[in-house]
């Protein structure tokens, strides 16, 4: 099985473009690939899934223990013919000024070879020096080959012998610049897959170009590894409760692994759209409002008053609810759109969502619960991450968050039926799915007792 990590010296090198092109090309070659993304990013896995339906998941060495990452990899890679893991940021760049949760740490944890994506613009011999530095920075870098991105055929033919001689690494090919296949960006990184016109056509052009300019035989020889040992599937519970999950263009940041954990815990997930639907699904015993871009759809969310009222009444009535980041903003009083206009929201929580114009409390942190609640026990902590350009006038204070000795804050609203806050939670390997489903089951029993 071909298994490898796509990494680069720095952000903006075209890792996602190359990864999507590779996945599409592997799919064309009948390899049935699956993809992983290093780190907490939501958008890149959405892109991976848009490439001819390729399965994609997150692997995060900050949010998850090494054994959990290995088990997730083995579980989701099973049955596929190739695995492509896309790194984040620069190869060694992790949490703070460390390699923790970096693409290198993921490659090291999984013992996978690395294909280094390099943009050669403005350098030649210096590229060799930079690559040498990356190779020798750690005793085992796992770097096995080089791919040139945004490179002409003429430049490739000049650089290939130079780089191979100076680094000892094979240069496997290049991806030429294709102006007709450019993917635009957004404030969380790349735009979401559903927003880009002719996405399939653009990725098809990239795949064709890469397939024609890649040494597939060498790539296969460098990346062939035994398939990971299968992991016994977790025992499925049968709680018999329905949990409504918001899923549309405003709420699109839910980890596939989190949803799988909820299913394993016994929940039946029912998807709905706070933008388009007029009311919540029937017979639900829980509500999950993940993150996304509600600020970009504040007007249609606000104008859908029947849905706002339904959610407000349900949450205030004790429906077990989890609202992360964008979902948290939706539960507030108002939410400013990109122009600064404030639109009424569900009105469950006291804060107002406001545009800040810069990243707010960005990155990984450690969150500790102050009291028992739907998802947490008092004193329990969880690794979390935040990434948002909007803030709230009231972020809550039911959790303590520690980022460093100098950077700490309080946030979140928690009760025996609610978690709401900016922090994104990663549920895998934690008791959170079981507790959420248990809360839904308790709510279901209460409803039945009330109706009897």
Regions found by a protein language model. Name each.
Residues 37-38, 171-179, 268-276:
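Beta-strand->loop->alpha-helix junctions that form or flank phosphate-binding loops
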Residues 112, 169, 316-320:
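A short helix->loop->beta-strand "cap" motif at the edges of active sites that frequently abuts
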Residues 124-235:
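Internal gly/pro-rich beta-alpha loop/helix module
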Residues 241-305, 309-314:
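Phosphate-binding active sites in nucleotide-utilizing proteins
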């Amino acid at each position: 099985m071909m298994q490898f990590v796509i990494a680069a010296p720095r952000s903006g090198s075209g890792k996602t473009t190359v990864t999507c092109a590779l996945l599409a090309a592997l799919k064309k070659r009948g390899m049935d690939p699956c993809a992983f993304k290093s780190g907490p990013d939501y958008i890149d896995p959405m892109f991976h899934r848009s490439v001819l339906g390729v399965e994609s998941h997150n692997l995060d060495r900050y949010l998850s223990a090494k054994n959990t990452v290995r088990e997730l990899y083995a579980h989701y890679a099973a049955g596929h013919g190739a695995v492509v893991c896309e790194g984040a940021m620069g190869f060694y760049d992790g949490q703070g000024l460390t390699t923790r949760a970096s693409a290198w740490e993921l490659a090291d944890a999984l013992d996978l070879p690395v294909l280094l994506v390099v943009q050669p613009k403005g350098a030649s011999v210096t590229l060799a020096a930079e690559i040498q530095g990356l190779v020798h920075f750690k005793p085992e870098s796992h770097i096995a080959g080089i791919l040139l991105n945004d490179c002409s055929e003429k430049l490739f033919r000049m650089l290939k012998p130079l780089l191979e001689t100076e680094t000892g690494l094979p240069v496997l090919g290049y991806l030429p610049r294709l102006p007709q296949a450019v993917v635009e960006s957004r404030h969380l990184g790349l735009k979401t897959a559903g927003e880009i016109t002719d996405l399939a056509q653009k990725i098809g052009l990239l795949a064709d170009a890469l397939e024609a300019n890649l040494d597939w035989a060498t790539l296969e020889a460098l990346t062939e590894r035994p398939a990971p040992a299968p992991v016994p599937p977790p025992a499925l519970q049968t709680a018999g409760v329905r949990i409504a999950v918001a899923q549309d263009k405003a709420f699109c940041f839910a980890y596939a692994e989190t949803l799988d954990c909820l299913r394993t815990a016994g929940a039946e997930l029912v998807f709905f759209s706070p933008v388009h639907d007029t009311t919540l699904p029937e017979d639900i015993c829980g509500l999950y409002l993940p993150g996304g871009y509600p600020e970009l759809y504040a007007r249609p969310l606000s104008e859908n008053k029947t849905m706002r009222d339904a959610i407000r009444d349900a949450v205030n009535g004790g429906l077990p609810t989890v609202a992360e980041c964008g979902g948290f903003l939706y539960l507030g009083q108002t939410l400013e759109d990109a122009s600064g206009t404030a639109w009424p929201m569900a009105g469950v929580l006291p804060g107002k969502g406001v545009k800040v114009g810069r990243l707010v409390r960005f990155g990984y942190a450690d969150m500790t619960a102050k009291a028992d609640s739907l998802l947490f026990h008092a004193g329990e902590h969880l690794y979390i991450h935040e990434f948002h350009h909007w803030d709230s006038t009231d972020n809550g204070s039911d959790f303590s968050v520690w980022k460093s000795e100098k950077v700490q804050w309080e946030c979140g609203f928690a009760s025996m039926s609610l978690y709401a806050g900016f922090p994104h939670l990663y549920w895998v390997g934690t008791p959170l799915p079981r507790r959420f489903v248990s809360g839904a089951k308790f709510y279901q029993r209460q409803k039945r007792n009330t109706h009897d």
